[in-house]
A protein has these predicted regions:
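Multi-pass membrane glycosyltransferase architecture that uses lipid-linked
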Residues: 3-4, 8-269, 282-427
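The feature marks long extracellular or luminal low-complexity segments
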Residues: 275-279
Length: 427
């Protein structure tokens, strides 16, 4: 059920921020935000995983050379993240911050790295991280707003806090420097717009999310059925679908006209042949899971009954099924907000699994990530060698992959077991 007893000050979160910050909940959230940002900057100052940020350096160099996102090899994603990189590159250029440099001596049989010889400068890395930290904070704010609508102030506060202080979230933005949080932000904005009966904006946001990374595809389909149930009108659903289609078209028209569609889709198409990440096996399952999402959406529309929590749980289960075969660690971040939004008390199990996974992620990334600062003299090579010698024996690929699977299986199993328990209790 939606919480009807939310205070007026909460719904003025974006329109009257000063009043909100003077409230008790506003002060508490502000303190959590400050603590989370301090942790991120401290961790980010010492650790930078050198891939894929090496590609961000190459993309920025392409932009400075007026080659665009796809003019030279280096950028293999759809344009949304590229536009963010373009903005960061402009600011970095205005401030005179160097992008990075080519360091051939880093690659070799006795070197720490064996896959990249392009390192970002400290300033460039921190500029990218700052943008990712802002996305983390915006995700927390949107989670809070959705939580207020669904569950009330106390639950919404803990959703904000768990997301923003979760070590897993911090590792991905501070060390791994991947933009999963941008995809999640757009996904949650789509969900919020649907909750607040704004189908056109929901369509825009879900399209932007899909054009960032494709994990919103199941929510995209499920919201077709949910939008019809919300209004009992095809016009409402048509607004959602049309806004989504127009947004996707606007984003891709320049790419198509320049003949760069292959490059824009390379991240997805290359994964079909990538046996190292397990993504190729996952792609074989996607048509079946997508079919299941269409069936669920149709059943939702035909029944005339749907709750936002049922929509969230169904999306969490379908999305986690694509991650049952262990893939890259950052992909699993999309499951965390879904777990926080599920109404079942058992989602604490999912949170615990994420906390354990955070430890493995930190150990795995940090053993490789300080080479940038050794090169720049930020820390000594002896200190890095000592640090790595302690952590590397703990970094077990077998255990690491096992816990990634545990997270995905838990997100599938917990809501299903809870449904069975509730049915049994009703008898």
């Amino acid at each position: 059920m939606m919480c009807d007893q939310t205070s007026n000050i909460t719904f003025r979160l974006f329109s009257n921020m000063s009043d909100f910050l003077r409230s008790r909940i506003g002060r508490d959230l502000f303190i959590v935000a400050i603590i989370g940002l301090i942790i991120r900057y401290v961790v980010g100052a010492f650790f930078t995983y050198p891939t894929d940020v090496n590609y961000w350096v190459i993309v920025s160099e392409n932009l400075f050379s007026n080659e665009g996102l796809y003019g030279l090899p280096g950028y293999y994603y759809t344009p949304v993240w590229g536009y963010v990189l373009s903005a960061v590159t402009s600011v970095v250029g205005l401030l005179g911050i160097p992008l990075g440099e080519y360091v051939p001596e880093l690659v070799g049989p006795n070197m720490v790295l064996d896959w990249t010889n392009t390192l970002p400068s400290f300033g460039y890395a921190m500029a990218i991280k700052t943008v990712l930290f802002i996305f983390d904070l915006l995700v927390a704010i949107v989670l809070f707003r959705i939580g207020m609508r669904l569950y009330g102030e106390k639950r919404a506060f803990w959703m904000f806090t768990i997301w923003f202080l979760c070590p897993f979230t911090i590792v991905i933005s501070s060390i791994r420097m991947m933009f999963e949080n941008l995809e999640i932000l757009l996904l949650l904005l789509a969900l919020l717009c649907m909750v607040e009966r704004r189908p056109s904006w929901a369509g825009v946001m879900i399209a932007l999310s899909l054009m960032t990374k494709p994990y919103g595809i199941f929510l995209c389909v499920l919201m077709i059925g949910y939008s019809y149930v919300q209004s009992q009108s095809m016009r409402y659903t048509a607004q959602y679908i049309c806004a989504m289609a127009v947004t996707a078209l606007v984003l891709f028209i320049p790419v198509i006209l320049n003949g760069q569609l292959d490059e824009a889709m390379m991240w997805l198409t290359n994964r079909a042949y990538d046996t190292g990440t397990g993504y190729n096996s996952t792609l074989n399952l996607v048509p079946f899971i997508l079919f299941a999402s269409f069936v669920a959406s149709a059943l939702m529309a035909l029944s005339g009954k749907a709750s936002i929590t049922a929509l969230i749980v169904t999306n969490a289960v379908l999305t986690s099924m694509t991650l049952l075969n262990p893939g890259n660690i950052q992909y699993y971040l999309v499951l965390l907000p879904m777990a926080l939004l599920m109404s079942y008390r058992s989602n604490i199990i999912v949170i615990i699994a994420f906390l354990i996974l955070s430890g493995f992620a930190f150990i795995s990334y940090s053993t490789w990530s300080s080479v940038l600062y050794v090169h720049e003299g930020y820390i000594g090579s002896d200190l890095l060698e000592s640090f790595v010698s302690i952590l590397r024996p703990i970094d077990s690929t077998l255990s690491y992959n096992w816990f990634k699977s545990v997270v995905a299986y838990t997100v599938v199993a917990v809501p299903l077991l809870e449904c069975v328990r509730r049915r049994y209790a009703e008898r």
